[in-house]
Amino acid sequence: MADKLIRATAADGGIRVVGVITTRLTEEARQRHKLSNVATAALGRTMASALLLASSLKKPGSRVNIRIKGDGPLGGVLVDAGLDGTVRGYVDYPQVELLPNAQGKLDVGRAVGDKGYVRVLREEKGEGRNELQESIVEIVSGEVGEDIAYYLDQSEQIPSALQVGVFVGTTTGVTAAGGILLQVLSKEASRDEVLVARLESRLRKLTGFTPLLRAGKGLEDIFQELLGDMGLEIFPAVQMLRFDCDCSFERALGALKFLGVDELKDIIEKDKQAEAICEFCREVYNANERQLIELVESLQAESC
């Protein structure tokens, strides 16, 4: 099943629905970063959440950045997603592995930690100037989905129900990943409360998002199960999603500049080359002696 995003409305436009399947891109992230199972789940949930949030952006080129920094052994999670359906991300300590929780599931909450913060940065592209909106909230549980739902309630004040999940097989890698976001858009507070209660109740009754995907159900099927009796209208447009990083050799050289003239000269003398690795995708860039010398000359010219 291809990675994709679809949108829908229900309750006469009072409910906005977005769903994503992110199985392949989560598996790509697992392989690129050599992630443990619990790190895969944490990063995968955050990538699905970021893509769901990015779907509400308006202008081409706009992006959402999510940073989750908890007190657990993973250290932190950083994800960047765009309105164009691209996403990238990493965790601070990708090799961390923990025993399953009491329910026998990957213990993402303990890996992330229940103390810390969630920072969401929205960048809307504009003509001549980008509009930045940053919000920071406390971590609720470290399970990611609950934390992002809390952010939506506290910072954007949009009544929301969110469920994200990742299933990692013992030997097969990621076999199911994705999420669903339900938001109440009506202006009547009393109606909001009733709708949110119904949505949360229905989400709780689901056997979980990834079990439905593993059972062969698509996003449209899940939407029907949740909202089929509430005037559901699924939009025909389907957006394809992918893991994608905009790093480049030129950017890697720019990063090496921050080492400074003295350290670059030391590298030239001792190693004759330098290696730069992109944190988001683990792409490796190698600069040879000639390129390093040109960097030094450029820095010296800038200081004159």
Swiss-Prot record:
One of its GO terms (biological process) is protein refolding. GO terms for molecular function: protein folding chaperone; unfolded protein binding. Under oxidizing conditions two disulfide bonds are formed involving the reactive cysteines. Under reducing conditions zinc is bound to the reactive cysteines and the protein is inactive. GO terms for cellular component: cytoplasm. PANTHER family: 33 KDA CHAPERONIN (PTHR30111:SF1). Redox regulated molecular chaperone. Protects both thermally unfolding and oxidatively damaged proteins from irreversible aggregation. Plays an important role in the bacterial defense system toward oxidative stress. HAMAP family: HslO. This is 33 kDa chaperonin. It comes from Microcystis aeruginosa (strain NIES-843 / IAM M-2473).
